[in-house]
Amino acid sequence: MLDNRPFKRLLLGTALALGLIGSAAAADLQPLRVANQKSTIKALLEASGETRNVPYTIQWSEFPSASPLGEALNAGAVDIGALGDAPYVFALGAGASLKVVSIIHSEGRTTTALVVPKDSPIKTVADLKGKKIVTGRGSIGHYLAIKALATAGLTTQDVQFIFLLPSESRLVLDNGTADAWATWDPYTTVVTSQSQARVLISGNQLLSNHLYLAATSQAIADKRPQLDDFVARVDRAYAWANTHPNEYAAAQARITGLPLDVHVTVAKDTRLNPVTIDDAVIRGLQATADTYQQEGLLLKHIDVSQGFDKSFNAKRVPFNQASR
C-alpha cells in the first residue's frame, strides 16, 4: 500500500501556515512534546499569548537544567527543546539524532560572565590559576570558563572545577568555597546586584550567545507541521519580549522567585533576535565541539554540521542576522 503520510503532512503544514486548518484537521496533528527549562520557552510563549489558538496540543516537560533536557531529547522522550552551544554539543556527542531548527541570539548586556566576590584579590583571568571555579558541568558557563582561561594561556588543568546547579553555585561563591562562578543571566545580574560580585570577564566577546531549538529527527519526520508552527511562534514571542520587557520580566519572576527588578534589568538590556541557520553558525558550533575535544571532555571528533536543518529557515520571520 502506498504510504501517503508525507503528502498528508505537507497538506497539513500548508493549511496550518495559511491559517486554514479546522478542528477536524487539527485532530490529525499529534501532540508536540516540548522540553522546558524554568522561566524559558513556556513562560515566554504564555506571556506573549502564543499558547492561544494552537491547533495541536503542546505537552510540556520541565527540566532543571540543560543537561537532563539534552538527555531527554537523546532518549526521544521529548520532540524539541532549547539548549545553549555547549549542552547541544554534548547531546550530539552522546549520539543524539537531533537537528537545530531555530536559533535565537542574545545581545546587549553581560548575558554570560565569570564573576568573583567583590573583595576578591583576583583581578585578572590569569589570577585564577590554582583557584576553584563553580559552574554547571557541560553548561554554557563551563564553556565560558574554558574560553576565558584560554585568553590567559591557562587550561582546565590549571584550575579546579566545582559542578553545581545555579541555585547552589551562588552559595559556594558567597561562602568562599569557590573563588569564581561562570554563569549566565539572570544569575549574573542577581549576584552582581545583591552580592556586589565583580565581572572578571564577560562572555560577550568569547561566546556566540546563541540559544538553539533542537528537534529530534523522528519529530521532524512525523511532526513537521507542528514544528514549523512552533518555531514561528517562538520567533514572534521573542520579538514581543523585545518590546514588552516589563511584562516578560513579570512572567519570569513569577516562576523563578527571583526579584522582579532583576528580571526587568535583564529584559530591558537584552535584545533577542532570530538567526538564520547558515555555515557561519555551524562553523562557530564546530569550534565549540573542537574545544571540548581538545580539553578531553569529548572523547571523539564530532561533525556538528549533521545537527542542523536549514530547511526551517524558510518558515521563520525575516532575519536581521546578528553577529556571530
Describe these PLM feature segments.
Residues 293-324:
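Conserved C-terminal helix/tail region of periplasmic/extracytoplasmic solute-binding proteins
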Residues 86, 161-162, 167-254:
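Pocket-lining segment of extracytoplasmic ligand-binding domains
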Residues 2-12:
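Bacterial N-terminal signal peptides that target proteins for export
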Residues 222-299:
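Secondary-structure end/capping motifs
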Residues 104-116, 194-219, 231, 270, ...:
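Periplasmic-binding protein-like
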Residues 27-155, 160-163, 179-182, 200, ...:
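Short, glycine-/small- and polar/acidic-enriched structural segments
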